[in-house]
Amino acid sequence: EDPIEMIEPALNQTQVQPQLDFGFAEGLRALMRQDPDIIMVGEIRDLATAEMAIQAALTGHLVFSTLHTNDAVGAVTRLADLGVPSYLIAATVIGVLAQRLARTLCPACKVRDDQVTRETLSEVAKPWRLSGGVRPYKPVGCLECRNTGYRGRAGLYELLLMSDAARATVHPSLDAGALRRQAVKEGMRPLRLAGAMKVAEGLTTLDEVLRNT
């Protein structure tokens, strides 16, 4: 980890120290000698770390890590950009979870939004239809939210599961669009749709969703 932000007694945690030439790749290499069942790499930043994580996965270890990308499909293209061969990506990546945080409306002062927002929301959600009642709200501002109109945050998630059909799109001439289309066909809910559902529930605003996705 870089740095260790929370001590977990049940885990064996190690902090990387680049000044001592002990980075994620070196830490992974040392960790492999301890025969772990599950490995968590704080972040994959370079090819060396990616290669070690891939090798750990190939030898039967369950590996978790993070990447800075725009969405779930972007994690696959990011690994390819780092230099990981497509056949190794297809062989080892099980799934990718993308996350965004959207501010939630203050329950003390939010008010119903107008019909225009309802119609715009339906357009944003296309080709999906929002189930249930659509109840968009807008921020106002009060003492409880310090006149911002927002209190707290809600997670927007996009889960990409690598099925056989999805893996088939991961080849040397990787087409991110083809992978995304296949994932959506198999039920992946894009970040923007996840946000639109939060708007329909009255938890956040369309502007906040569009800003974050």
Which functions belong to the PLM regions below?
Residues 1-213:
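Short, flexible helix-loop junctions that flank or precede catalytic/ligand sites
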